[in-house]
């Protein structure tokens, strides 16, 4: 789990996301509270439940980007899902409990990597011995000179560690990768499907196969194989489930798309039905997975939505009550667009400069040019559909279209993107109401 303070988390998010201080502070505090809770006594810890968050803001202002960056900072099981992908229990489609099953799979992978990292040194030693056995087979006769053989082994061990034998080929027994069998499961029978897949998986274990490969490649494969042998699978599952239950984070995107709109007749299986199914998950229930039973009482849920066609109050009251922290994200201004073009790590302007440099073309964005690009994107957003920062991608692509097309023929050339260049390439499209609609 991440031990970063809220200030450090916000600082990391600032490197990639412009503005939205309230949202950053809320997710930073929520992430820190996960760490704080784990410092409490076990009995008291069970009484502290996470305060789930609802992020509200127009499209393209950074809701999903906050989730992506948070996943890298969390160092805990984290899953981002779209609420629109699920249907009510009993109908064709994915059930919401699949979220917890997928989160548990992520925790298994995370825990396995951590455990394999801890026993990597032992795995390297075992892999080294197996390679030396392939290079110097053990003598079949008991009267062979063991001292001489041991000295030779040490000489080869030294060469192996100094990478002098990397390109030498050897024959070695390597475990065969298991062939996965995908079974389509009917709704409500996912657990039975998982058991069948496990059965086929165990039946299909192939014996090790002798392969000829270079020592460098063989060493990597053998380290992974030996590390996997050293990991206790039962302990792995227990630790992963504990990790999910105590530190798991679920990011529910597009939650506004499952709000009920107007009066409709008949069952609403992909909207209000999904909300009802989400209630026990958010409140706390037990979900059956192929790795064991997972309790969701202390999993943190962060929901987000644009709410352009609906309002947060359109969510069913029970779900509203389970998302107590509300954060409103601000619409982006022309100044925000200017900062987005220059301040974040690997900003759009830096990306185009780097891409064109591969062709030997030098691109320079002036201050006036960046201001003009930001203003053009903001104007198109105001006149047509406001899609936030995503507008910058299409405006920049249109602006750089000619240079990108001719770059391979103009190696050594330089281009200055100033206000005049931007005006010449974008003014007609921005000013023409009909054409500006085609700049998606």
UniProtKB/Swiss-Prot annotation:
It comes from Shewanella oneidensis (strain ATCC 700550 / JCM 31522 / CIP 106686 / LMG 19005 / NCIMB 14063 / MR-1). GO terms for molecular function: ATP binding; ATP hydrolysis activity; peptidase activity; proteasome-activating activity. ATP binds at residues 18, 60-65, 253, 318, 390. ATPase subunit of a proteasome-like degradation complex; this subunit has chaperone activity. The binding of ATP and its subsequent hydrolysis by HslU are essential for unfolding of protein substrates subsequently hydrolyzed by HslV. HslU recognizes the N-terminal part of its protein substrates and unfolds these before they are guided to HslV for hydrolysis. The keyword Nucleotide-binding applies. SMART domains: AAA, ClpB_D2-small. The keyword Cytoplasm applies. Belongs to the ClpX chaperone family. HslU subfamily. One of its GO terms (biological process) is proteolysis involved in protein catabolic process. HAMAP family: HslU. It is found in: Cytoplasm. NCBIfam families: hslU (TIGR00390), PRK05201.1 (NF003544). Coiled coil: none annotated. GO terms for cellular component: HslUV protease complex. This is ATP-dependent protease ATPase subunit HslU. Keywords: ATP-binding, Chaperone, Cytoplasm, Nucleotide-binding.
């Amino acid at each position: 789990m991440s031990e970063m303070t809220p200030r450090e988390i916000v600082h990391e998010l600032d490197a990639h996301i412009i503005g939205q201080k309230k949202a950053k502070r809320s997710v930073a505090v929520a992430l820190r509270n996960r760490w704080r809770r784990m410092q409490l006594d076990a009995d008291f810890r069970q009484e502290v439940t996470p305060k789930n968050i609802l992020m509200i803001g127009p499209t393209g202002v950074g809701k999903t980007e906050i989730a992506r960056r948070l996943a890298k900072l969390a160092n805990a099981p984290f899953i981002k899902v779209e609420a629109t992908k699920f249907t009510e229990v009993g109908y064709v489609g994915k059930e919401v409990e699949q979220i917890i099953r997928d989160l548990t799979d992520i925790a298994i992978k995370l825990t396995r990597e951590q455990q394999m990292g801890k026993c990597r040194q032992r795995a390297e030693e075992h892999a080294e011995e197996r390679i030396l056995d392939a290079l110097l087979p053990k003598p079949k006769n008991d009267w062979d000179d063991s001292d001489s053989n041991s000295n030779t082994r040490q000489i080869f061990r030294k060469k192996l560690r100094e990478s002098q034998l990397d390109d030498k080929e050897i024959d070695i027994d390597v475990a065969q990768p298991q062939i996965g069998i995908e079974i389509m499961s009917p709704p409500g029978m996912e657990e039975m499907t998982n058991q069948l897949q496990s059965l086929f998986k165990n039946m299909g274990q192939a014996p090790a196969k002798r392969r000829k490969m270079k020592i460098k490649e063989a060493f990597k494969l053998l380290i992974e194989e030996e590390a996997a042998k050293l990991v206790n699978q039962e302990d792995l599952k227990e630790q992963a489930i504990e990790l999910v239950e105590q530190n798991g984070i679920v990011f529910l995107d597009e939650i506004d798309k499952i709000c009920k709109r107007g009066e409709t007749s008949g069952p609403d299986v992909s909207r209000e039905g999904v909300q009802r199914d989400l209630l026990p998950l958010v409140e706390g229930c037990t979900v059956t997975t192929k790795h064991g039973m997972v309790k969701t009482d202390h999993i943190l849920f962060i929901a987000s939505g644009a709410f352009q066609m609906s309002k947060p109050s359109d969510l069913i009251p029970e779900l509203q009550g389970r998302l107590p922290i509300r954060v409103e994200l601000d619409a982006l201004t022309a100044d925000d667009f200017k900062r987005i073009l220059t301040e974040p790590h690997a900003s759009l302007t830096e990306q185009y400069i780097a891409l064109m440099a591969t062709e030997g073309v030098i691109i320079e964005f002036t201050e006036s040019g960046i201001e003009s690009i930001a203003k053009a994107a903001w104007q198109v957003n105001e006149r047509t559909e406001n899609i936030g920062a995503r507008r910058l991608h299409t405006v920049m692509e249109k602006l750089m279209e000619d240079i990108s097309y001719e770059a391979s023929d103009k190696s050594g050339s330089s281009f200055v993107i100033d206000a005049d260049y931007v005006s010449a390439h974008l003014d007609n499209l921005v000013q023409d109401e009909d054409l500006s609609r085609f700049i998606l």
